[in-house]
Amino acid sequence: MEKLTEQQKLEQRRLGPVNKAAFRFMVGLATVLFKKKYGVSFTYADDIRPYRGKPYIVVSNHASRVDYVFTAPAFWPDTFNFVVGYNEFFRSHLAGVLRAMQTVPKKNFVQQPYAIRQMIRIIRGGG
């Protein structure tokens, strides 16, 4: 049998909502490690409390490879799946974490039905 490429492995994954305990642990760890270092603070333009625990989609501006440091704590304690650039799955120090956190790989600047299908799957699964 032919060995699968990394792209084939990624595209065969069937994603679901992120594990809440693992997500909250990672957010807590990132907060401890990076919040003070990067001076992260939050100012809410809208009251998001009515949305807590309900399904919603977060669309954020791309800041850097550490977007999660700015995005995830702002919505605490809610959890969500990130959509991350496909190329990030080839970084050895990130690949395992991205897979464990049910992160959706998305190729940059192209339409990718796989990513859309996985997002729909996650939403239907309660994520």
Model-derived segments and spans:
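A transmembrane-helix-recognition feature enriched in membrane-embedded lipid enzymes
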Residues: 2-46, 92-101
